[in-house]
Structure formats: structure tokens, C-alpha cells
């Protein structure tokens, strides 16, 4: 059977509705689109959870050891791939605002590297840092001054510090960046993804005298979202991780059913002299048409879903979701091949009676 004949017969079967291409394509698109869409939304949810975890400063680990934290060692933690930012702080004498002398503000001396941990927006090189909450409460702005009993202080920058479970001390405190060589009380390190290695590294910045009775405490800036967030494990163990294989199964069933229901037609063609290879080629082309169309429709719907979802890495999420519709199309081809391969010419009259 020539290629032109195979192409002509396949096209005729699709055009006349013999292969039920439209219904099978829609079935594949809907089933695989739903399965892959649910998986995509699950992954996007995990991505949003990870973003919220970092935004809440839950990924910031701390070590506390009064007057025993080496600021240089603390800042050097960023040499490790586990830590993206680190800085030290120590409480100092409270500041008395000129406008509200009855309500002193807690103050901290901090290393400049702590700014990256806190997300300080500091366009001015010199001055103090305050939280956005405190700035709003006192009517302060970056570049303005905070009047105190010790004189005016320039507000060099602000940082977000909402009341979401994180260490509340910094919400109404004034942070004074300094380069003075001194020992600090705490070292904060932002590490992502969260691993136990960060805690081990934090302990190395503490220089405790052998006879000291001070406790070294490792903690977390915000404990409200859990001690750790293993994004990789959450992704690998998500309940929808088998969605692509579900799509492959759906495709196989549709491909098999689409050809199995025509076994009388194929057995008759075999009886009339059509070769098995020609029949397989014709069936594969017909299936490729509707499976490809279904994959395109399902993939387009997934693209719209991912685009509208606001996923941080839309390309990666779409590639993951597209695996489902791709496997669905491949499953359909496999199912069709199996169905045609199981047709036997000698069963022609049985197929006729069972039709």
C-alpha cells in the first residue's frame, strides 16, 4: 500500500467522522487539561507557600550569645552556599524621641550586612534604619530626621516588618548601622532553601570563653510557619505528582477504544488484502491527528491557566504541566497501536456477530 493511499485513507476517515477524531480530541484535551491543570495549580500553590515563607522572614535563623558573637565571622557566613545574607545586632541604650519623650524607642547597634537580611531600602549611606510601621507611626520618611534627646538622626532607610509572628522587637526599634569592632549578642542568617547546615554555621560565629555560663541559643525570626520548609520534598511528594501518568493512561484508553470499536472494519480490510503494516500506519496517522489536536487544545488551555495564575516561574510550571498532555498524546498512539495489533482476520465473523 503506497504512502499516498495511506495518507488519503487516513484523511478521509478523519474528515468523514469515521475515526471520531473531534470527540476523541476533545476527550483527551479535557481529561489531560484537567489533570495537568490541577497539578499546575498544586505546584503554583507550593511556590506561593515558599514565597510567603521567605517574605515572613521564617527562613532567617538566629544565634544568641550575649557579647560573644563575632561580627566578621557572622558576615562571612555568606561565603557558604547555604546562606544568602547575614548580619549581627546588639541592644543599646533606648532612644528618647523629642516628640514623645515618655515613650522611648528600643535601639540596636547592627552591622551594615544586616540590611540585606531585613530587606532594608536605604538610598542614603549614613543614618539609621526604622521599620515601615514605625516610620508611618512617627510620620518619618527616608531622608528625613528623627529628633531625639541626643540630637537629630537621619533616617537612611526603612524595612518591612509587619506583625505576622516575626520577632516583634524590631517593629518599633531604631537600628544604628556601625562599623565599630565589638562583640554582638546575635547573628541573623537568611538561608534558602532551609537546611540544618545554617544552624551549624551559626554556632561557629560564637566566641564563648570556656568558663562562660552564658547559653548559646539557636532560633528563628518567625516561627509561625514552621521551623523549616522543604520545598523540594513538598514538590516531590505532592499528591498530584502522578497526573502526567494519569494523562498517559487516559490517552491509552481513548486510543485503544477509538480503534477497538472499529475492529470489524479493520478485520474486513485485512480480509480484503490490506497488510498489517499499512493498517497500523493508517491507524497511527488518524490517531496522531486527533491526539495532536487534543494536545494543542489542552496545552493552550494550560498556557492560559499558568499565565493568569501569576506563577513566579511561569515557563517552568508550563513545561511541567505540558508533560501531561504530551504523555496523553503518546499514550493515545500506543493504545491505538495495541488495539490494531490485536485485531485478527480470523475473528471477522465473531466481530460481525458482536457488533
Model-identified regions with their sequence ranges:
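Alpha-helical transmembrane segments
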Residues: 11, 32-58, 338-342
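Basic-flanked hydrophobic alpha-helices used for secretion and membrane insertion
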Residues: 77-84, 91-226
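A hydrophobic alpha-helix feature that marks transmembrane segments and, especially
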Residues: 39-40, 244-267, 279
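Transmembrane alpha-helical interface segments in multi-pass membrane proteins
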Residues: 268-336
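Peri-transmembrane interface segments
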Residues: 209-247, 256-260
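Membrane-proximal extracellular/periplasmic loop immediately following the first transmembrane helix
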Residues: 1-3, 46-109
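C-terminal membrane-exit region of the final transmembrane helix in multipass inner-membrane proteins
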Residues: 327-355
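N-terminal Sec/SRP start-transfer signal
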Residues: 1-35
